[in-house]
């Protein structure tokens, strides 16, 4: 499998970061296709619906969930007046569905994390297309020799 790991700090509080990353009102801002329903996460887009297991949900600490056959997590920790966010995706090499393969999926999460950082720093969300190009190119080079 592949492991995509991204670590960054934001000037937002732990509570603000958690609210954005792990609540329905937060998802509405950066990933409106997601909703928490009981102990599952529901992804709905253009007639497609997938119910994914919520694997961990520790308030202000960690959210982890199945993402198709991958596992995605956000872990939060306090750093003085900042919050450290660690994103991880463990993704099988044969990951794939009608929308994405492993590379496209990782590109999407790299873009999402840039957007999350901007939201938490009170900035306008970036235009996604140039970010997709940047990260797609980066991953092509990274995965080339594997």
Placement of each model-derived feature along the sequence:
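Short, highly charged C-terminal tails/helix-capping segments
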Residues: 118-146
């Amino acid at each position: 499998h592949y492991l995509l790991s991204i670590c960054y700090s934001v000037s937002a509080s732990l509570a603000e970061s958690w609210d954005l990353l792990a609540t329905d009102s937060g998802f509405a801002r950066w990933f409106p296709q997601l909703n928490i329903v009981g102990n599952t996460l529901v992804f709905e887009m253009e007639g497609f619906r997938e119910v994914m297991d919520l694997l961990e949900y520790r308030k202000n600490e960690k959210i982890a969930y199945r993402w198709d056959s991958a596992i995605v997590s956000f872990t939060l920790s306090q750093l003085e007046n900042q919050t450290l966010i660690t994103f991880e995706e463990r993704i099988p090499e044969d990951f794939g569905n009608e929308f994405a393969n492993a590379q496209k999926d990782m590109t999407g999460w790299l873009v999402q994390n840039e957007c999350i950082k901007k939201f938490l720093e009170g900035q306008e969300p970036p235009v996604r297309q140039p970010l997709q190009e940047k990260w797609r190119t980066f991953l092509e080079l990274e995965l080339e020799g594997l």
